[in-house]
């Protein structure tokens, strides 16, 4: 291949993946949404790829994934990897962007708990294989140990390290560039206007009206201000499924995974995305938000203009989650339960955040973000 990747052929095996269709939504560079089934690859095929391309053998297990086929390769109890077979709908430059990002982090911040690329035996960070007549790109990365954050009990004690780790990640990404970084992505808060047409797929009237107001406020109060704020490549998806914690000490972050939604966007959108999943159920809905922001600010100081937009950006991220999930569920009813798994909690959080006055919200955040740190 002209880009240096090697194409290898693998025989067809019976798929061990669920025969229930799982669909992935991928935004193209032309801002048009493409829908493509997740590639069907068996554990046998994945193991053959590992052996031929990476010279590795062991036990292969299927992992969950919305867009790609992911596998855990256990070579020894102390040596594990994640093999990712990338969705054919993902543009090659977007895949290269994610690979380049991980290589950049390995060089700039080797101490960060993020996946590390294992090159092929030919020394390539990616390879390309043909399965059932379809060319698919493949990436092998280190498998990070830890318990998914969503399985751990909510803990305010985790927030300082989580916020600090995200800030250190963003510090490492500062200055990183790639031609595909400025891609069109539905999950990019700074492009929230592209999701508004999907409001028609929200069936509940009260929720529909609330979401409409959220998008209206974004258009009038947020979008104009975002254009003046600093931008860089961000992770853009620090949800509890993409954070790993120490199972014996769930106040310690052991991994940040899944850079599939990384994008060049306003830095404050990184913080807003993470905080959209940290609205508490207790008497103080900002119980986890405040220590997270304080720790982030300590490592990556936020400006007053950025802090002032956080409440609306958090609400907008929740609006994206609710709208996109219900649109996809209407298209793929067989996968409805999985697609809607986060909707009830997200709707509850959006309603809660609406009860908190904007000035009060901003004041509490400013109190833990001293000017002299900026």
Predicted regions and their residues:
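Conserved NTP-binding catalytic cores of kinases and kinase-like/nucleotidyltransferase enzymes
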Residues: 12-122, 247-249, 368-373
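An alpha-helical support segment within catalytic cores of ATP-dependent transferases
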Residues: 39-50, 177-178, 193-236, 246-248, ...
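Active-site acidic catalytic loop and adjacent metal/ATP-binding pocket
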Residues: 66-77, 82-83, 117, 219-269
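ATP-binding pocket architecture of kinase catalytic cores
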Residues: 79-177
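A glycine-centered beta->alpha junction motif in the catalytic cores
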Residues: 123, 138-151, 197-201, 321-336
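A cross-family kinase active-site recognition segment
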Residues: 149-209, 229-231, 337-342
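Active-site activation/catalytic loop segments of kinase-like enzymes and analogous catalytic loops
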Residues: 267-301, 315-333
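ATP/Mg2+ or Mg2+-diphosphate-binding catalytic cores
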Residues: 321-374
């Amino acid at each position: 291949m002209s880009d240096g990747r090697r194409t290898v052929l693998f025989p067809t095996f019976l798929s061990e993946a669920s025969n229930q269709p799982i669909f992935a939504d991928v935004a193209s560079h032309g801002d048009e949404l493409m829908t493509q089934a997740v590639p069907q690859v068996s554990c046998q095929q994945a193991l053959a790829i590992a052996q031929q391309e990476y010279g590795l053998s062991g036990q292969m297990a299927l992992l969950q994934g919305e867009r790609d086929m992911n596998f855990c390769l256990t070579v020894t109890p102390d040596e594990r990897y994640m093999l990712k077979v990338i969705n054919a709908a993902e543009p090659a430059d977007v895949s290269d962007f994610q690979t380049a990002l991980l290589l950049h982090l390995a060089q700039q911040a080797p101490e960060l708990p993020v996946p590390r690329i294992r090159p092929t035996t030919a020394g390539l960070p990616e390879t390309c294989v043909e399965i059932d007549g379809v060319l698919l790109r493949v990436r092998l990365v280190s498998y990070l140990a830890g318990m998914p954050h969503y399985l751990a009990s909510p803990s305010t004690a985790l927030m300082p390290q989580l916020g600090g780790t995200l800030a250190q990640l963003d510090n490492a990404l500062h200055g990183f560039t790639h031609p595909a970084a400025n891609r069109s992505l539905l999950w990019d808060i700074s492009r929230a206007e592209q999701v508004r047409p999907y409001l028609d797929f929200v069936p509940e009237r009260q929720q529909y009206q609330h979401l409409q107001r959220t998008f209206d406020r974004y258009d009038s109060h947020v979008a104009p201000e975002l254009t003046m704020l600093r931008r860089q490549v961000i992770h853009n998806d620090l949800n509890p499924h993409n954070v790993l914690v120490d199972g014996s000490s769930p106040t310690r972050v052991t991994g940040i995974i899944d850079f599939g939604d990384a994008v060049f966007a306003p830095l404050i959108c990184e913080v807003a995305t993470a905080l959209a999943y940290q609205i508490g159920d207790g008497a103080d809905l900002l119980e986890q938000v405040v220590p997270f922001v304080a720790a982030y600010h300590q490592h990556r100081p936020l400006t007053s203009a950025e802090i002032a937009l956080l409440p609306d950006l958090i609400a907008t991220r929740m609006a994206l989650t609710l709208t996109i999930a219900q649109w996809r569920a209407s298209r793929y009813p067989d996968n409805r339960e999985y697609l809607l798994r986060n909707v009830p909690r997200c709707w509850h959080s959006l309603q809660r955040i609406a009860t908190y006055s904007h000035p009060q919200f901003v004041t509490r955040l400013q109190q833990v973000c001293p000017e002299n740190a900026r």
